[in-house]
């Protein structure tokens, strides 16, 4: 595709994507705003999670912003692919006793794959979002790099580690060198109707933040109760179904043995939730799969990195080593709490994202 200055901006109705659209227009881009219709409930009405990118109010907010800054605006239907790649994945992972991150799946398959395809169909070379991240081309490496944003408290590179070189060529992150308060101030000065709109906190398609209810309604199989056992296999009681538990969880277990118990493992095959004491929640080794690397073509030898195992975690010193089947062995210098299958581990060198993958299991 011939390079041009047309860009599709994914507009969620929030302040970040709204300011992104404005900044790109000011930079001379031919900006087209698009809101992705991604999820509807069984009554075919838009899910209304307050502040969420799926709500009808979000569409109205995005349209008002587009009118205010003077850009074209469309709503595009991504419902079927979103259900397949995000909803079904979310439900299936919980049924397997794992804890998924739907935002990572949405970025990988929807925002930077499907939306990019739609952009190309309307002759737009770029897709832009309101993510806090920086993209740069490194002449020496001959590669695009993904780097942490200036506002480290808002940095979103953890959920972007799956980006490919082709995708990075066609992606713009206008907010990478801004701080959040600067973005809000700019929106306020521009008179944008979303200037003071709060950030979305919950998963956009789960109403009331009730994961269990959502999974029960969308699962193809019955959620069955099962047994709690300790790390030696001794029976402790009964659980309500493995979808209600995640590694490191303490609350809501309904089991009392005199000392606090935590979820340390989930055996989906046998429908068993394994409980242990505080020290048993920690581990310093894991294996990741579905790995993607950005700053390097592939991992060919042992490498010292900083790594983190969840979005809000602090980076920790670690060594990563390639395994024969494309998986990666990760050894932390210090034990980490609640290494959780289904979540992602992301590797950094300073501000540069090396890559990352999905946690398959804790080794020890």
Curated annotation (Swiss-Prot):
Write out the annotated subcellular location. Cytoplasm
Note the superkingdom of the native organism. Answer: Bacteria
Could you tell me the EC number(s) of this protein?
Answer: 2.8.1.13
Of the GO CC terms on this record, one is: cytoplasm
One GO biological process this protein is involved in is:
tRNA wobble position uridine thiolation
Question: Reaction(s) catalyzed by this protein?
Answer: S-sulfanyl-L-cysteinyl-[protein] + uridine(34) in tRNA + AH2 + ATP = 2-thiouridine(34) in tRNA + L-cysteinyl-[protein] + A + AMP + diphosphate + H(+)
Disulfide-bond pairs as recorded: 106-204
User: Which positions does UniProt annotate for ATP binding?
Assistant: 10-17, 36, 130
Where do the catalytic residues lie? 106 (nucleophile), 204 (cysteine persulfide intermediate)
Which GO terms label this protein's molecular function in UniProt? Answer: ATP binding; tRNA binding; tRNA-uridine 2-sulfurtransferase activity
Q: Where is this region: Interaction with tRNA?
A: 154-156, 310-311
Instruction: Assign the protein's first listed, main location to one coarse class.
Output: cytoplasm
Major enzyme class:
transferase
In this chain, the site described as Interaction with tRNA is at 131, 343
Q: Which UniProt keywords apply?
A: ATP-binding, Cytoplasm, Disulfide bond, Nucleotide-binding, RNA-binding, Transferase, tRNA processing, tRNA-binding
The cross-references to PANTHER family, in alphabetical order and at most eight, read: MITOCHONDRIAL TRNA-SPECIFIC 2-THIOURIDYLASE 1, TRNA 5-METHYLAMINOMETHYL-2-THIOURIDYLATE -METHYLTRANSFERASE
What's this protein's function?
Answer: Catalyzes the 2-thiolation of uridine at the wobble position (U34) of tRNA, leading to the formation of s(2)U34.
- What family, per the record? Belongs to the MnmA/TRMU family.
Q: Under what name is this protein listed?
A: tRNA-specific 2-thiouridylase MnmA 1
What organism, scientifically named, is this protein from?
A: Thermoanaerobacter pseudethanolicus (strain ATCC 33223 / 39E) (Clostridium thermohydrosulfuricum)
Taxonomy of the source species: Bacteria, Bacillati, Bacillota, Clostridia, Thermoanaerobacterales
């Amino acid at each position: 595709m011939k390079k041009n200055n047309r860009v599709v901006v994914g507009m969620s109705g929030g302040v970040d994507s709204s300011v992104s659209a404005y900044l790109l227009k000011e930079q001379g881009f031919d900006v087209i705003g698009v809101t992705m219709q991604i999820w509807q409930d069984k009554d075919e009405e838009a899910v209304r999670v307050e502040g969420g990118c799926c709500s009808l109010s979000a569409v109205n907010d995005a349209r008002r912003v587009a009118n205010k800054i003077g850009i074209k605006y469309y709503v595009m239907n991504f419902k079927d692919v979103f259900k397949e790649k995000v909803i079904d994945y979310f439900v299936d992972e919980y049924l397997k006793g794992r804890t998924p991150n739907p935002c990572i799946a949405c970025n990988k398959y929807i925002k930077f794959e499907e939306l990019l395809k739609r952009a190309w169909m309307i002759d737009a070379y770029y897709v832009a979002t309101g993510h806090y991240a920086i993209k740069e081309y490194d002449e020496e490496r001959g590669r695009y790099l993904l780097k942490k944003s200036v506002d480290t408290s808002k940095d979103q590179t953890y959920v972007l580690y799956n980006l490919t070189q082709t995708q990075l060529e066609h992606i713009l992150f206008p907010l990478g060198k801004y701080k959040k308060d600067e973005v809000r101030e700019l929106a306020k000065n521009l008179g944008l109707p979303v200037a003071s709109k709060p950030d979305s906190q919950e998963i956009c398609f789960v109403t009331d933040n009730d994961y269990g209810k959502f999974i029960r309604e969308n699962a193809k199989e019955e959620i069955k109760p099962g047994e709690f056992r300790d790390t030696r296999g001794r029976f402790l009681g009964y659980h309500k179904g493995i979808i209600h538990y995640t590694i490191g969880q303490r609350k809501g277990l309904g089991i009392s043995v005199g000392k606090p118990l935590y979820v340390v493992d989930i055996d989906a095959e046998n429908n068993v939730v394994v409980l242990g004491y505080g020290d048993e929640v920690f581990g310093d080794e894991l294996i990741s799969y579905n790995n993607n690397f950005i700053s390097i073509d592939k991992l060919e030898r042992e490498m010292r990195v900083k790594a983190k195992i969840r979005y809000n975690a602090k980076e920790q010193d670690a060594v990563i080593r390639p395994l024969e089947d494309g998986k990666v062995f990760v050894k932390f210098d210090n034990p980490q709490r609640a290494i959780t299958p289904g979540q992602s581990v992301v590797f950094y060198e300073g501000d540069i994202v090396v890559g990352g993958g999905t946690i398959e299991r804790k080794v020890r």
